[in-house]
């Protein structure tokens, strides 16, 4: 069984608000999401797991319809998603009662629930946020059950105000893989067992380095996962060694030369200032 795990897509967000490229960044988020859908379709991936915050805020009905059409375009892939703290399921949310495509399952309940997919021999567990902050780990005590061969868990949180959890304890629950969201930096918490996919595209200048998705396989030999860089944009610290006698013109020239050596889709941040004599 093969899966793609994404999280924190934040559709509708325009990073770097106020800058000339902000609108382009917002469109890049949508385009990266479309690209991941096309990838899942080409590879006939069994599952697309979305571990919360697909949207930056409460989704509009037209946005849900757009996303649903994309999901429907990959009928051989089962899409399972939960809502996170940004797109939580409030009482008047359009998530409630939405008619998803046949290959889509949203685990809408604020309490842990499970969907079984017999043709994939897989059960997927998880719960959605019903408010911005959840101070307890609602997934504590959830264990695989039933007759399915493989068991996956979707989890959004991991900090003090968003379902705080102990990765080691969760990994001992018996799931084949725990797909995490909320933290935007990709990271393997437990090798081949539990990971943050990170934001599909970086959403601010603090999120340095590659962003993308987790690719995984579960079979009789166990679970194997790997992080795959996929984002169009990447933030990178750019450090220039300058002296106190460097003029503004010389500094700008030096900066342009450095930028010319790098890729177009890298976004640069300025780290903490250093002593100009160094």
Regions found by a protein language model. Name each.
Residues 9-11, 54, 129, 189, ...:
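Hydrophobic pocket-lining residues within nucleotide cofactor-binding pockets
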Residues 53, 87, 275:
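Acidic Asp/Glu-based divalent-cation binding sites
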Residues 34-43, 249-265:
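A short, well-ordered alpha-helical element
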Residues 27, 111-118, 197-261:
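Binuclear metal-dependent phosphoesterase catalytic core
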Residues 47, 57-217:
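His/Asp/Glu-rich metal-coordinating catalytic cores
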Residues 1-66:
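N-terminal active-site segment of His-dependent metallophosphoesterases
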Residues 15, 135-138, 224-227:
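Short, charged, solvent-exposed linker or helix-capping segments at domain edges/interfaces
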Residues 268, 273-278:
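Single conserved hydrophobic/aromatic residue that forms the stacking wall/gate
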């Amino acid at each position: 069984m093969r899966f793609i795990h994404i999280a924190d897509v934040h559709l509708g967000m325009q990073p770097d608000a106020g800058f000339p490229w902000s609108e382009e960044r917002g469109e890049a988020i949508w385009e990266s999401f479309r690209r991941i859908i096309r990838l899942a379709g080409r590879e006939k991936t069994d599952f697309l797991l979305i571990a919360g915050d697909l949207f930056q805020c409460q989704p509009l009905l037209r946005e849900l319809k757009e996303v649903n059409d994309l999901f429907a375009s990959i009928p051989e892939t089962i899409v399972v998603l939960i809502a996170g703290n940004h797109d939580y399921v409030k009482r008047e949310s359009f998530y409630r009662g939405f008619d998803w495509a046949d290959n889509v399952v949203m685990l809408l309940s604020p309490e842990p629930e499970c969907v079984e997919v017999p043709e994939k021999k897989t059960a997927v567990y998880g719960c959605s946020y019903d408010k911005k902050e959840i101070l307890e780990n609602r997934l504590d005590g959830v264990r695989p059950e039933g007759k399915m061969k493989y068991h996956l868990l979707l989890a959004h949180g991991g900090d003090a105000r968003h379902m705080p959890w102990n990765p080691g304890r969760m990994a001992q629950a018996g799931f084949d893989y725990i797909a995490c969201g909320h933290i935007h930096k990709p990271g393997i918490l437990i090798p081949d067992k539990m990971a943050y996919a990170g934001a599909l595209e970086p959403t601010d200048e603090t999120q340095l380095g590659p962003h993308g998705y987790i690719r995984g396989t579960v079979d009789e030999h166990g679970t194997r996962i790997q992080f795959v860089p996929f984002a169009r944009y990447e933030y990178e610290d750019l450090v220039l060694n300058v002296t106190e006698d460097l003029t503004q013109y010389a500094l700008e020239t030096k900066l342009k030369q450095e930028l010319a050596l790098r890729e177009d889709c890298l976004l640069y941040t300025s780290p903490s200032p250093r002593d100009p004599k160094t």
